[in-house]
Regions:
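Helix-to-loop junction immediately C-terminal to a conserved catalytic motif
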Residues: 60
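Catalytic Walker B motif of ABC-type/P-loop ATPase nucleotide-binding domains
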Residues: 170-173
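Hydrophobic anchor residue at the start of the ABC signature
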Residues: 159
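Conserved catalytic motifs of ABC-family nucleotide-binding domains
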Residues: 166
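Conserved ABC ATPase "signature" region
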Residues: 76, 123-141
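Conserved ABC ATPase signature
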Residues: 145-153
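Conserved ABC transporter NBD signature motif
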Residues: 68-77
Length: 225
């Protein structure tokens, strides 16, 4: 399918996906249907549990789906080989629940780490770093090491790192799980700002305060599990 045709379809489409609990006859989810479209802010909400991490693993290609269940721009991901999966993952920015920062490195080096992996020039790295830190208003912490940061500061760094390489979409997996209400609002504001910068956002959360706050500030799609 030509790229211009694919633009009309969702970035991610899940169709009738069923997954079972290990060693159980109980389904984790049954005939799940989900879409993530370009430019949208989608919130996946539900109780904490294994289902959300399993859903993310399918979307990022860590778990291989059955044929005709998970699609990227209408390409059946069941047919992706290892190289296809690696190229696809480069198009995703991920904000992890536990940050996944390198504690010995500075804030800057953590944020630009994806660019280093792609062997970008120093000039390009500096320009992208300056742009993202200004837009997210985190210039004040850029010379610190990550081991000295608070939880919400670490999550701000993680969001900047997820955005630095201009991904097709960002997955934020429970980004406020250990934050108080005020810090939760700040993270919500950063995700809203990321969406305004034309980033497609998929937020996974069980935090109803975060859900209500983001809903009050911007248009969202809500997917309940």
């Amino acid at each position: 399918m030509a790229d211009n045709q694919k633009e009309r379809f969702p970035l991610i489409a899940i169709k009738d996906l069923t997954r079972w609990y290990p060693d159980s006859r109980e389904p984790l989810f049954k005939k799940l249907n989900f879409e993530l479209s370009k430019g949208e802010f989608t919130i996946v909400v539900g109780k904490s549990g294994i289902w959300k991490s399993t859903l993310v693993k399918f979307i990022i290609g860590q778990l291989r789906p059955y044929t005709r269940t998970v699609y990227y721009k209408m390409d059946d991901m069941a047919h992706f080989n290892d190289e296809d999966v690696q190229q696809y993952r480069r198009k995703i920015g991920i904000v992890f629940q536990d940050y996944k920062l390198i504690s010995s490195l500075s804030v800057k080096e953590n944020i630009v780490y994806p660019l280093r992996l792609e062997n970008e020039s120093d000039n390009s790295i500096q320009a992208k770093y300056r742009t993202i830190t200004q837009k997210l208003h985190i210039e004040d912490i850029n010379k610190l090491t990550c081991k000295t940061l608070s939880g919400w500061e670490k999550q701000k760094v993680a969001i900047a790192r997820a955005m630095i390489n201009d991904p097709e979409f960002i997955i934020a997996d429970e980004p406020t799980w250990n934050l108080d209400r005020e810090c939760t609002k700040e993270i919500g504001d950063l995700l809203i700002e990321a969406n305004k910068m034309w980033n497609t956002i998929m937020l996974i959360t069980h935090d109803m305060n975060l859900l209500d706050y983001i809903k009050s500030k911007t248009k969202v799609n809500i997917f309940k599990m």
